[in-house]
Amino acid sequence: MIRATSVTAKFDRAFDTITLDETARHRRRMMMRSDNGIEFLLDLPEARLLNHGDGLLLEDGRVIEVRALPEPLYEVRGRDSRHLLALAWQIGNRHLPAEIAEDRILIRRDHVIRDMLEGLGAMVTDITAPFSPEGGAYQAHSHDGHSHHQGHTHDHHD
C-alpha cells in the first residue's frame, strides 16, 4: 500500500486529486481513495487540516492535490463591522467552527443557531461553499520536540 507521508504546497503538477469536506480534511492517519480511485494510506506525523490546494506527497514522488468539497453552510453578515464582531463573539462563545472574513462569517447549518443569529439582527443566507474554519487558540504545531501555539516564534540556539 502506497503512503502519503507529508503535505506540500509546492508542486508542479498533481497526479490526481482528492475532494473532501472539512471534517474529512482534518486527519493524521487514514485509508483514502483519490477521485480517480487510487487507494493510499495518509500517514502524517500529526493530525492537521488539509487545505484546499495542498499536495499529499506519495512515497513514489507523485502528488495528490486536495480539493475542498463545497458544503451546506450559512453566510452570516452584520449591519456593520461592529455588529459582525458581536456576532462572531456569539458564535465563538458557542465553540462553533467558523470561517471569518472581513465582511462575513461562514458556519455549518444549524437552525437553532440561525434563529439566534437572526434574533440578534444578523442576515443569514444558505450557501454551498468550501469550508475552512479558523484554527483554535490551543491548536499548536511542534518543532524539535516542543510546540508553539500559532503566532509564537523565536530563534533556537545551540
Curated annotation (Swiss-Prot):
<keyword id="KW-0963">Cytoplasm</keyword>
<feature type="region of interest" description="Disordered">
    <location>
        <begin position="133"/>
        <end position="158"/>
    </location>
</feature>
<keyword id="KW-0143">Chaperone</keyword>
<dbReference type="InterPro" id="IPR036118">
    <property type="entry name" value="UreE_N_sf"/>
</dbReference>
<dbReference type="GO" id="GO:0016151">
    <property type="term" value="F:nickel cation binding"/>
</dbReference>
<dbReference type="GO" id="GO:0051082">
    <property type="term" value="F:unfolded protein binding"/>
</dbReference>
<dbReference type="Pfam" id="PF05194">
    <property type="entry name" value="UreE_C"/>
</dbReference>
<feature type="compositionally biased region" description="Basic and acidic residues">
    <location>
        <begin position="141"/>
        <end position="158"/>
    </location>
</feature>
<dbReference type="InterPro" id="IPR004029">
    <property type="entry name" value="UreE_N"/>
</dbReference>
<dbReference type="Pfam" id="PF02814">
    <property type="entry name" value="UreE_N"/>
</dbReference>
<protein>
    <recommendedName>
        <fullName>Urease accessory protein UreE</fullName>
    </recommendedName>
</protein>
<dbReference type="GO" id="GO:0065003">
    <property type="term" value="P:protein-containing complex assembly"/>
</dbReference>
<dbReference type="GO" id="GO:0006457">
    <property type="term" value="P:protein folding"/>
</dbReference>
<dbReference type="InterPro" id="IPR007864">
    <property type="entry name" value="UreE_C_dom"/>
</dbReference>
<dbReference type="InterPro" id="IPR012406">
    <property type="entry name" value="UreE"/>
</dbReference>
<keyword id="KW-0533">Nickel</keyword>
<dbReference type="GO" id="GO:0005737">
    <property type="term" value="C:cytoplasm"/>
</dbReference>
<comment type="function">
    <text>Involved in urease metallocenter assembly. Binds nickel. Probably functions as a nickel donor during metallocenter assembly.</text>
</comment>
<keyword id="KW-0996">Nickel insertion</keyword>
<comment type="similarity">
    <text>Belongs to the UreE family.</text>
</comment>
<dbReference type="GO" id="GO:0019627">
    <property type="term" value="P:urea metabolic process"/>
</dbReference>
